Amino acid sequence: MKKLFGTDGVRGVANVYPMTTEMAMQLGRAAAYIFKSSSKRRHRIVIGKDTRLSGYMLENAMVAGICSMGVDVLLVGPLPTPGIANITSSMRADAGVVISASHNPFQDNGIKFFSADGFKLPDQIELKIEKLIESNKIDSLRPTASEVGKAFRIDDAAGRYIVFLKNTFPTEMDLSGMKIVLDCANGAAYRVAPAVFEELGAEVICLGVSPNGTNINADCGSLYPQVISEAVKKHRADIGIALDGDADRVIVCDEFGHEVDGDHIMAICATDMLRRKLLKKKTLVTTVMSNMGLDIAMRAAGGKIVKTAVGDRYVVEEMRKGGYNLGGEQSGHMIFLDSNTTGDGILSALQLLAVMRRTEKPLSELSEVMIALPQVLVNTRVREKKDITTIPEIAARIRDVEEKLGNEGRVLIRYSGTEPLLRVMLEGKDTYEITAWANEIIDLVRKHLGEKQ
């Protein structure tokens, strides 16, 4: 059972356990030990980060830990998470490290790893790293003299990633004549994303491109789609694109300012790939959080859906296991496995823009491929993550609601993998009813598991 690693690496408040410099150094040492093979060549690990103030101290601690084990470090600076995955594989490094807490506020930070092929580490490798740290087994391993590692800065990392992204866009197309509102959340994509869309010919109105270390995700980015919505209407743009702090997810809005979430983007791209016979096994991989409307849209187009637990890592695992090439989450994580190994907000936006260009249809019209069932999501903070089915009062209320919904809706209860939160999601035909039921369930959760005041 992993203790340090959650569903997306190690995460917490910066400078508070486990997100301390001491732990970052230990993670660096343990990871370096595991990724070193028996070969005599020098080993290299890529380290990138987002724009958080705490990124500097954690980066330096990781560098110290890795170099102390005789492994070199390639520093790429602020770069989107998928860019770090891409650089890791393209530079034939042994592993990649991302220092980011994604969509969380600036006070938080996180550390996650990619293996040499650019995919997130499997659970068993993360468990090995944890056990090494707990056992103190490698404390005595101290390379000396010329055996210690050194750090290099890769100055053209952003440029390499920009070229990679542009090459995923159809060569016979460009974005000339399109007006795009782009919100980079004052995060890792603040330089890369504007360059990609501008170099493809679009007129880009940029928001969230002035990071100062404390404004990442602050009233901007994919968690605040109303920002691009207002800007699209003001500038009469064709589309609004909002990334999160590490740019592994994207939310967009159409030319009228209406939000288009990950489910709709997947529906648009998957049905387009079905038409062009490019969707492997005619299958889209999603999570249990995706709206039932997506299932209906895929069936109508002649495709099918495979569902996983929540978390893009589980989507990717299912895609690799089943031989599928498109998957994602309602939150905006989308994986185009023919192009990249992990969720990529900029790449996903480019694929959506390609469908708009190919069909010569506005986003509002393309979005009609899917009609979402009313969905309500309510969160509450909890003091412990106890199995809900063991609390009779809550379990009975959930069963009662499920009986009332029948085959025309569903109840989904799950804990966040990265925060002390419980999420209650209901789908059904009547928004008023499902909202009331969701609030009833959440009130019972607060009664039994809520944080003590």
Curated annotation (Swiss-Prot):
Annotated TM spans: none
Catalytic reaction equation(s): alpha-D-glucosamine 1-phosphate = D-glucosamine 6-phosphate
Binding site for Mg(2+): S102, D244, D246, D248
Cofactor annotation: Mg(2+)
Record-linked SUPFAM superfamilies: Phosphoglucomutase, C-terminal domain (SSF55957), Phosphoglucomutase, first 3 domains (SSF53738)
GO cellular component terms given for this protein: cytosol
Keyword annotations: Isomerase, Magnesium, Metal-binding, Phosphoprotein
Positions carrying Phosphoserine: S102
CDD domains on file: GlmM
Modification comment: Activated by phosphorylation.
Cofactor binding description: Binds 1 Mg(2+) ion per subunit.
EC number: 5.4.2.10
Listed GO biological process terms: carbohydrate metabolic process; peptidoglycan biosynthetic process; UDP-N-acetylglucosamine biosynthetic process
GO terms of molecular function: magnesium ion binding; phosphoglucosamine mutase activity; phosphomannomutase activity
Pfam families per UniProt: PGM_PMM_I, PGM_PMM_II, PGM_PMM_III, PGM_PMM_IV
Source organism, top-level taxon: Bacteria
Residues of the active site: S102
Function: Catalyzes the conversion of glucosamine-6-phosphate to glucosamine-1-phosphate.
Family of this protein: Belongs to the phosphohexose mutase family.
Protein name as annotated: Phosphoglucosamine mutase
Gene: glmM
